[in-house]
Curated annotation (Swiss-Prot):
Residues 467-533 are annotated as: Binding to the cap-specific mRNA (nucleoside-2'-O-)-methyltransferase. One of its GO terms (molecular function) is ATP binding. A motif (DEXH box) lies at residues 150-153. Monomer. Interacts (via C-terminus) with RAP94 (via N-terminus). Interacts with the cap-specific mRNA (nucleoside-2'-O-)-methyltransferase. This is Nucleoside triphosphatase I. It catalyses: a ribonucleoside 5'-triphosphate + H2O = a ribonucleoside 5'-diphosphate + phosphate + H(+). The keyword Nucleotide-binding applies. The gene is NPH1. Its EC number is 3.6.1.15. It comes from Amsacta moorei entomopoxvirus. Residues 378-541 form the Helicase C-terminal domain.
Length: 648
């Protein structure tokens, strides 16, 4: 074990001794009932309150673990450390009433010292700039400051440079650093996913909690490990509290555990029609010409739905384009009103027997071919729904023409019942959600499907879901986790028999007829990001107060505080990565790219990672099957691996 651990362990026990008198209950003044904190909530509160020099902490807890209540408990009892505090709470505007204001009013009588700032509101940030000087001048003389940042990853993402240019939020970020690290002030950050995109976000998060102590670089991560793990860990000791019930990321299957449904992962590789492929190629050219091409916007739209005669926006202004979209939707909606597939056709469709059945109505076959021509994804979605034993969730962020509106036309053709939870259904969605979640609908007999957009990706829960379909990929795993998390909650499946307590997660990956796929591109980006982020999460877990306390639970407490003032002011030495020699065993192979199987290439394979190198540079990664076995073909008695492009 590392040298500093035992000293930090002594300080944790010092804080626990110092705060023995704090109650593990908190009174709800509205209901006049006492709430008992969970052991982990009580533990972290006592450490944060009991250690004066531990001025910063991250609550790295899963969604639903009680971060808000813990923060409110700390607000209530931090006066044990000093009698007068200004409380500054940074949150998303949508979270002001519930949970924050409601929770604070329930447990704290005097809220006059609490100020809210919305980090997603320019007017609220202007308010912060206006009160910044008055807060700064009052510190040390008569008050101390406690800063609380909810969903800190959303704030941090606003600080990361874009195209090497500083973001507008950077001045606010710098002021927060100055206030948080002013003598005797404290900062508490909270997130279930503290890093969502890249290493720069992690550096900025640490820069907020412990300024100038380190700067991690991507080259420190090699083969899924940090080459300077020990140095980083000692710099970050006790920087966070770690509480995650399920550590697997969204792309990893999990078994049923502690009230959480089993998660199965399915990838559906589907081929677009010639018409959809043609429009995709047009969209690709359009994306490359525009400033927002990196967002792959038009390709994503066409991958979902490509109505005939629907052209790329081109030179149309927004009004003209929206009018054209409305007109085309009306045409498509009118066309599908006359389609109502027969029971015999639907049964054959469910079982993938359309091509071999010769007695199906010719009208059904023609209509099916037309619908498939417009969207291979929506056809596959209908097949998954019809084969599901229970209720189905569908994530479709495209609310208008290319998304939910056209998808509902497909459902009508296949007699699939549904509700919609999006920004367009504000007046009806809550009542419909109650009907969908009703006990009598646990098997989806009354309402089979709920289509939801980003409006439903946070803050709501669905019960007894058996399948969730991801029609359009978000850009990072944390958003994906929020989306899938709507269907897998604590005890969300308790009303189903044991054998039905599962959720099948379906990723729809559509390809053109020449194997282009924006879905695959985004999925690969997510996987690459998350591989590095998981290394960071492992570092935070190892540095957490729980990890240290579990080892040194019975060590003699420190007599007074000495260590954290030193830790948070000691900068980790920069590592010269060029001096670090890492030996990797490589094997010569023949391979080809999946999209160009005619060209046979030579390379050196790292069997541990399936990465192929040429001239000391990673150039490709082997494709694997569901059993994690590399895919290959045999040509002229030569084994040839199938690979995708890979960039380090």
């Amino acid at each position: 074990m590392f040298a500093l651990d035992s000293i930090v362990g002594k300080h944790i026990n010092y804080a626990l001794d110092k705060t023995q008198h704090l109650p593990n209950k908190i009174m709800n003044n509205i209901t006049n009932t006492e709430i008992t904190l969970q052991d982990y909530q009580y533990f972290v509160s006592r450490i944060f309150i009991g250690l004066k020099n531990l001025n910063s902490m991250l609550l790295f807890w899963d969604t639903g673990m009680g971060k808000t209540l813990t923060a409110v408990y700390i607000i209530k009892y931090i006066k044990e450390l000093f009698p007068r505090w200004i409380i500054l709470i940074f949150i998303k505007k949508s979270l002001y009433i519930d949970p924050w204001l409601n929770t604070i009013r329930s447990y704290i009588s005097d809220t006059s010292n609490i100020k809210f700032i919305y980090y997603d509101s320019s007017s609220s940030l202007d308010k912060f700039n206006n009160i910044y000087r008055s807060i700064e001048s009052s510190l040390n003389k008569k008050s101390r400051l406690l800063i609380i940042i909810d969903e800190v990853h959303k704030l941090i993402s606003r600080t990361v440079k874009k195209d090497n240019n500083e973001r507008n939020f950077t001045p606010i970020y710098k002021k927060l650093i100055k206030l948080a690290n002013f003598e005797n002030n404290k900062i508490l950050c909270m997130s279930a996913t503290p890093v969502t995109n890249n290493i720069s976000e992690f550096n900025n998060l640490i820069g907020l909690l412990r300024p100038n102590v380190m700067n991690i670089k991507e080259e420190y991560i090699n083969n899924g490990k940090l080459i300077n793990f020990k140095e980083l860990r000692e710099t970050l000791l006790a920087i966070c509290s770690y509480k995650r019930l399920i550590e697997a990321d969204s792309l990893t299957e999990t078994n049923y555990i502690d009230g959480y449904a089993k998660k199965n992962i399915f990838y559906h590789n589907i081929i677009m029609s010639d018409e959809q492929s043609k429009l995709y190629n047009m969209a690709e050219k359009y994306d490359y010409k525009t400033e927002l091409g990196g967002l792959k916007t038009m390709r994503r739209l066409i991958s979902s739905f490509a109505f005939y005669d629907l052209k790329i926006k081109g030179d149309l202004d927004n009004i003209e384009y929206n009018d054209m979209i409305k007109r085309k939707l009306a045409e498509f909606s009118e066309f599908t009103k006359n389609i109502n597939f027969s029971e015999s056709f639907i049964e054959s469709f469910k079982n993938d027997n359309i091509k071999i059945k010769t007695n199906l109505p010719i009208t059904d076959i023609n209509n099916y071919n037309i619908l498939y021509q417009y969207s291979c994804k929506y056809i596959e979605t209908c097949k998954i729904i019809l084969n599901s034993r229970g209720k189905v969730l569908i994530f479709e962020p495209l609310v208008n023409f290319e998304g939910i509106s056209s998808l509902k036309c497909y459902f009508n053709c296949f007699n699939i019942s549904y509700i919609e939870y999006s920004s367009k259904t504000l007046k009806t969605r809550d009542n419909e959600l109650n009907e969908y979640n009703n006990y009598e609908n646990n098997n989806g007999k009354k309402v089979k499907v709920c289509i939801f957009s980003y409006a439903g990706s946070e803050g709501i829960s669905f019960k007894c879901i058996n399948d969730i379909i991801i029609l359009d990929m978000p850009w990072n795993e944390s958003e994906l986790k929020q989306i899938i998390g709507r269907s897998i909650r604590l005890n969300s499946h308790k009303d189903l028999p044991q054998e039905y307590r599962y959720v099948n997660v379906h990723f729809l990956i559509s390809y053109t007829n020449n194997r282009k796929s924006v879905d695959k591109e985004i999925l690969d980006i997510i996987k690459d990001k998350q591989g590095k982020i998981n290394v960071i999460f492992d570092l935070l877990k190892s540095s957490s107060i729980e990890s240290i306390h579990n080892t040194y639970k019975y060590i003699e407490p420190a007599e007074n505080e000495i260590i954290f003032d030193t830790i948070r002011k000691t900068r980790m030495k920069e590592m010269n990565v060029s001096n670090v020699i890492i030996n990797i065993k490589l094997y010569p192979i023949s391979y080809c790219k999946d999209y160009d199987r005619a060209t046979i290439l030579k390379g050196l394979l790292n069997k541990d990672t399936n990465i192929v190198y040429k001239d000391n540079t990673a150039v490709a990664k082997l494709m694997i099957d569901k059993d994690n076995i590399p895919i290959f073909i045999i040509e002229n008695d030569t084994l040839i691996y199938i690979a995708d492009d890979y960039y380090e």
